[in-house]
Regions:
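Class II aminoacyl-tRNA synthetase catalytic cores and aaRS-like
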Residues: 1-168
Length: 169
């Protein structure tokens, strides 16, 4: 957090105009040529020299992104290197497909929206300790998509019963 502040970036309390949900972006293919602007939480992150890959997630889905030092600039790439799992980031760029065929957002520019205070568990292993899953429910909801979907369905069922009982007394 202090490193970002020293670089002149406020790691909290920034307004960002998100134009595209990730679910919407995933409906396009790499030939559309459209510039997308989205935001989400970093759930996977790896750097390889002057390049970086990662995955962001918003409430509608997740997408892989690619950051290249030559495209974002050296100063921006140094800021990117300070990012980590759980941080919120705003991305702008076009789509392409990797050699493995995965749809990926090639980042032209990005903004740090919020720095994570506590690190999330690594994505590969996730939350394996049952006690931690129950005690830190908020982490389980972030890391496990199925748990989030189950919670949403539960809320919808409760909302239905409440509205039914209010109408039929």
């Amino acid at each position: 957090v202090e490193e970002l502040r020293e670089a002149g970036i406020e790691p909290y309390g920034r307004k960002y105009e998100k134009i595209n949900d990730i679910e919407e972006i995933n409906k396009y293919d790499e030939t559309c040529g459209k510039v997308f602007k989205t935001a989400g939480r970093i759930i996977a992150y790896r750097r390889m020299g002057k390049n970086g890959f990662g995955q962001i997630q918003d409430p509608t889905g997740k997408i892989q992104y690619y950051v290249k030092k030559d495209e974002v600039g050296e100063e921006q790439y140094e800021i990117y290197k300070k990012m980590g799992l759980g941080d919120f980031i705003g991305l702008e760029g076009k789509l392409f497909r990797t050699n493995t065929g995965e749809l990926t957002l090639r980042v032209d520019s990005f903004e740090v929206l919020s720095k994570n205070v506590r690190p999330l568990p690594e994505k590969f292993h996730g939350l394996t300790n049952i006690e931690t899953r129950y005690r830190q429910r908020y982490v389980d909801l972030v890391m496990n998509r199925e748990v989030m979907e189950t919670m949403k369905k539960r809320f919808q069922i409760i909302r239905f019963f409440r509205s039914y009982l209010e109408k039929h007394g």
